[in-house]
Every structure is written in C-alpha cells, then in structure tokens.
Amino acid sequence: MASSSSNRQFSHRNANTFLTYPKCPENPEIACQMIWELVVRWIPKYILCAREAHKDGSLHLHALLQTEKPVRISDSRFFDINGFHPNIQSAKSVNRVRDYILKEPLAVFERGTFIPRKSPFLGKSDSEVKEKKPSKDEIMRDIISHATSKEEYLSMIQKELPFDWSTKLQYFEYSANKLFPEIQEEFTNPHPPSSPDLLCNESINDWLQPNIFQVSPEAYMLLQPTCYTLEDAISDLQWMDSVSSHQMKDQESRASTSSAQQEPENLLGPEA
C-alpha cells in the first residue's frame, strides 16, 4: 500500500500560529526571517524560533508566529522552508506555547514584540482568572482541518486528548482511515502483452500439469485395491499417459469436415 493521503481541503486561519519542524537543523534566525517574509501580507508582529534536540540527538525547530491579521492558508506546504515541512497548529494559548518553546532550547531567536493573552477584567489577578479551555468538538475540528496524514492525525489526537486516545483508539483509527484512505497500488500484469503469443500458455501449462492433470502414485494406489507396490502404480500411470496421449493425437488428426452432427440413437420404448 502507498502512504495515506487525502483529497480533503487543508485549512488554517489564526493570528497565532504554532509550527513544529521535525528533524530540522535549520538556524533559528534564518528560519525566523524566512517565515516572516512568508506572512508579510498579514502584517507579522512577533516570531519566536527555538532549536531543540530529540533524545536520539536529531534536531527539531519550534516557532510561534503572531500576526495583526489572521493567517489564512489552504496549502499545507505554505510554511515549508528549504524542503522541511512543519506541523501547523493554531496556538490556542500563546503564553503556554511560548513557555513550551523556551523550556530547553539549544538556540533561540526572536523578532518583534510578544503579544500576551488579554489581561483580566475588573482588577482580578491573572491567577484568579482561569483560561477557558476549548471543548472536545473545537479540538477535533482544529485537528481535522490541520492534519495532513493519518499518522499526523492520530499523533495530534494523542497529544490533545490522551485519555480519549487511549480508550477509543479503534474509533480514531476508523475515522483516520476514512479521512486518509490508503491509495491502492496499480495492478501490474506479470505477463505483459506480446505478439504473437498473447496468453503465455507456457505458464498456464506449467501450473495445470502438476495441479490438475497429474495423479500421484500414492493417490492411484488408494483408488486401485489390486495395486500393491509403488512401482506398479508408476508403471500403470505411465501406460495410461502414453495411451491417452496417442488417443488425443489421433482425434486431432481426424478432424471432421461435415457440418452434420451425429444424432443420438432412439431407444425402443416398452411394448404396448
């Protein structure tokens, strides 16, 4: 099977964008400048890029992008840089995303002024105001609109809804197969058309002889009670093969030229 894909329309619309470039050794400063230039039409205000290391030593890149106008794209490859493709998500909580990016960076680059989430009303402290959590419907809607493959879809669900993922994985796998169906491999005929032999009779005969027409000596001994030894069975089979081959050749050599077919003999009925 080919890798899963889908004809679904990718969609991203948000002023706060969280990008993750797996296995990307790109310099954060260079990546920031490239991403900044991609979103000029939406008036970029802030970008943060940080390079981190996986446990296996490979490098990956995180980026938080904030724009004055919501970024609207339908091309999942829009944020590709130098051949590296990112996972694109809406940053629902820019404060948490920024803290996550800055947890253990190897290198960091920032440009612009960070725009934190809105301040609490009526003089309440930030700790007194609980940030509204998105509903499961909102989370799944965002995942469906951003996922570009079956693997990415399941990975995003595992990250955002770990309990549901662990208890309802079979349902998520079913929806993943529907959203990203496997591409059926095109059938390749092992016997390509040729001229003048179009049916490849040799291959058919090679299969017919041992599977259909051939009787083993052991099977013959079971059917013939008077055959007591394997040698007798082989001798009988060789004789029958020789006789039947000659009969077939004789029939082929005596081809009929008459259109009249032999009628079955009418049998006499019972006496009245």
From Swiss-Prot:
Region called Binding to RBR1, residue ranges: 198-202
Positions of short motif RCR-1: 18-21
Superkingdom, natural source: Viruses
EC number from the UniProt entry: 3.1.21.-
Predominant subcellular localization, coarse grouping: host cell
A molecular function (GO) term: metal ion binding
Motif stretch (RCR-3): 100-103
Boundaries of every CRESS-DNA virus Rep endonuclease domain copy: 11-114
Compositionally biased spans, kind Polar residues: 254-264
Binding, a divalent metal cation: 52, 60, 62, 104
Keyword flag Transferase: yes
Residue ranges of the TM segments: none
Keyword terms, alphabetized: Activator, Covalent protein-DNA linkage, DNA replication, DNA-binding, Endonuclease, G1/S host cell cycle checkpoint dysregulation by virus, Host cytoplasm, Host nucleus, Host-virus interaction, Hydrolase, Metal-binding, Modulation of host cell cycle by virus, Nuclease, Nucleotide-binding, Nucleotidyltransferase, Repressor, Transferase
A single cellular component GO annotation: host cell cytoplasm
Pfam families: Gemini_AL1, Gemini_AL1_M
Motif RCR-2 mapped to chain: 60-62
Function: Implicated in enhancement of V-sense gene expression. Acts a an inhibitor of C-sense gene transcription.
Subunit text: Homooligomer. Interacts with host retinoblastoma-related protein 1 (RBR1), and may thereby deregulate the host cell cycle. Part of the C- and V-complexes which are RepA-Rep-DNA complexes involved in the c-sense and v-sense transcription.
Family assignment from sequence similarity: Belongs to the geminiviridae Rep protein family.
Protein known as: Replication-associated protein A
Species of origin: Maize streak virus genotype A (isolate Nigeria)
